[in-house]
């Protein structure tokens, strides 16, 4: 959903809740201020303090994002969408695993390295299997590492899957991962993936954003989750840790086994087509609005 929220839930939103939420969350005590460039930080801080912070009372609210409660065995979830006319049997099947925290730079680089090795190009083992199977039309757009939240998520799957092929897709992915671990990964692939990761992490241009903004956004997760943002900028130390660990036998294979294969916090997700999905949803919303409207007073 976009920032407007879920229309069905907006019906239940009260004015008091909205005001309280705004008071609690939209407060400078929750803000992180960045400066970049050849500027005098003291002058910027004085300006912010005079024009912003002095206009507010300090807030005692502690805003923090808790880690997801871990599940002890994989969970299967099915949701629905309204398909295009030619996609009535177009199922999306995705397996996703919850990993470590995104604001830990070594954990983040490890996870990126594993994802790159498995999925970066057509020669990568998991991508090769997914691209060459007849079980689906193409890779799911959810495939890869999601690093925009507090905890990392690794996902792999297909779109264009027949209704009766979900279990086959799950078996295909899990068997591929097990084969990668048992057969081993070539040092050439590992070093190539590491080299590409270093280039990408150190890249100054190419993202379409100013370099200063890139740095700020890379530091933001650590700021939001009460960690040291300077650790994120110290790429050399983090890569040195990774390179040192790569000297151990089967380091990447062990990571794949630990983070993915033996990780019970897995969701087997299926997005299934339903040509009546939109009409059903609109009916539910209309019924809620009608019920709500009947109970409204003039003061409401």
Over which residues does each language-model region extend?
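Polysaccharide-binding surfaces and accessory modules of carbohydrate-active proteins
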Residues: 62-77
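Short, low-order "capping/linker" segments at domain edges
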Residues: 73-83, 201-205
């Amino acid at each position: 959903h976009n920032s407007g929220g879920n229309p069905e839930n907006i019906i239940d939103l009260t004015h008091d809740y909205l005001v309280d939420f705004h008071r609690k969350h939209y407060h400078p005590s929750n803000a992180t201020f960045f400066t970049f460039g050849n500027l005098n930080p003291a002058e910027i801080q004085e300006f912010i303090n005079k024009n912003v912070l002095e206009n507010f009372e300090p807030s005692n609210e502690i805003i923090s994002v808790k880690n997801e409660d871990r599940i002890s065995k994989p969970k299967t979830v099915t949701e629905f969408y309204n398909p295009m006319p030619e996609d009535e049997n177009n199922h999306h099947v995705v397996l996703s695993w919850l990993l470590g925290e995104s604001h830990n730079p070594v954990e983040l680089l490890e996870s990126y390295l594993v994802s790159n090795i498995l999925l970066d190009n057509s020669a990568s083992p998991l991508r090769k299997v997914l691209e060459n199977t007849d079980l689906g039309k193409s890779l799911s757009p959810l495939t890869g590492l999601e690093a925009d939240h507090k905890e990392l998520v690794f996902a792999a799957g297909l779109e264009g899957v027949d209704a009766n092929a979900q279990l086959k897709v799950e078996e295909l992915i899990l068997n591929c991962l097990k084969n990668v671990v048992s057969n081993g990964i070539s040092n050439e692939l590992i070093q190539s993936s590491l080299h590409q990761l270093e280039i990408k992490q150190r890249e100054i241009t190419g993202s379409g954003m100013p370099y200063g903004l890139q740095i700020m956004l890379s530091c933001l997760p650590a700021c939001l989750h009460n960690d040291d943002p300077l650790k994120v900028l110290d790429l050399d130390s983090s890569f040195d840790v990774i390179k040192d660990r790569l000297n151990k036998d089967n380091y990447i294979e062990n990571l794949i086994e630990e983070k993915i294969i033996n990780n019970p916090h897995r969701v087997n997700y299926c997005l299934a087509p339903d040509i009546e999905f939109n009409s059903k949803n609109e009916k539910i919303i209309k019924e809620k609005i009608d019920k709500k409207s009947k109970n409204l007073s003039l003061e409401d």
